[in-house]
Amino acid sequence: MVYNLGMENTTLIVLVEDDSFISGMYQTKLKNAGYNVEVIADGELAWERLQKDPLPKLLLLDVILPKKDGFEILEDLRKEDRTKNLPVILLTNLGQKPDVERGVKLGANDYIIKAHFTPSEVMERVEKVLHASN
């Protein structure tokens, strides 16, 4: 599948993932689709980045992170006027029903269990969330 053909895309996506193999794979897929991508490997640095401009158009957020987990980040984002409507996709290995329910309750726009989706399917979900937020 081909994403964002044609005009250059300036859409910024922040990817928060501490596994360098996974972050590298998604960074490549997103860049090949024309997105600008910032990769951050720990939750505390991600939180600090999200307090600055420009805000990304989408946050792809792992849950299990060093220093501050993705659930905490999501909960804090939804409390702040500046970031309460920021689209967030949780991209995680946590696949138990209580984890999914918690992510949805905290306000995730989508919840993707890494082992259940191919990178192409994740890209489709990214496109869907970005389209819905415009």
Question: Which residue ranges define each predicted feature?
Answer:
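Charged docking surfaces used in two-component/phosphorelay signaling
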Residues: 24-32
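Acidic, metal-coordinating helix/loop segments flanking the phosphotransfer/catalytic sites
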Residues: 39-58
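Conserved acidic carboxylate
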Residues: 17
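The feature encodes the CheY-like receiver
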Residues: 66, 84, 96
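Active-site residues of response regulator receiver
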Residues: 62, 92
